[in-house]
Amino acid sequence: MAKGQSLQDPFVNALRRERVPVSIYLVNGIKLQGQIESFDQFVILLKNTVSQMVYKHAISTVVPSRPVSHHSNNAGGGASNNYHHGSNAQGSTAQQDSEETE
């Protein structure tokens, strides 16, 4: 189980540490927005006007409002080349959405 969290924990912790605004999409399609205040193995505490405890099993996607460096102790930085965040990823999603509506 620790192997599976080697990407998740540093990513979520970087979002928390840098107070990056995030959009969290749940599996039922609901979009939540705020800043990650805290997290553990099972939940994320999301703060906006109120604090919400969101169970990780209900989360589909976490989208940061800006790129985040989430690799820890990676001198080569190779892991960051495999993951792209920001306008390019969002642009391709918008393009896919427009193609579906045509």
From Swiss-Prot:
GO biological process entries: regulation of DNA-templated transcription; regulation of RNA stability; regulation of translation, ncRNA-mediated
Biased composition (Low complexity): 70-88
GO molecular function terms noted in the UniProt entry: RNA binding
A single cellular component GO annotation: cytosol
Key words, A-Z: RNA-binding, Stress response
Signal peptide coordinates: none
Family annotation (Gene3D superfamilies): 2.30.30.100
Record keyword RNA-binding present: yes
RNA-binding is among the record's keywords: yes
Domain Sm: 9-68
InterPro entries assigned: Hfq, LSM_dom_sf, Sm
One protein family per Pfam: Hfq
Disulfide bonds: none
Region (Disordered): 63-102
Its job: RNA chaperone that binds small regulatory RNA (sRNAs) and mRNAs to facilitate mRNA translational regulation in response to envelope stress, environmental stress and changes in metabolite concentrations. Also binds with high specificity to tRNAs.
Stated family: Belongs to the Hfq family.
Oligomer and partners: Homohexamer.
HAMAP family cross-referenced by the UniProt entry: Hfq
Entry protein name: RNA-binding protein Hfq
Taxonomic placement: Bacteria, Pseudomonadati, Pseudomonadota, Gammaproteobacteria, Enterobacterales
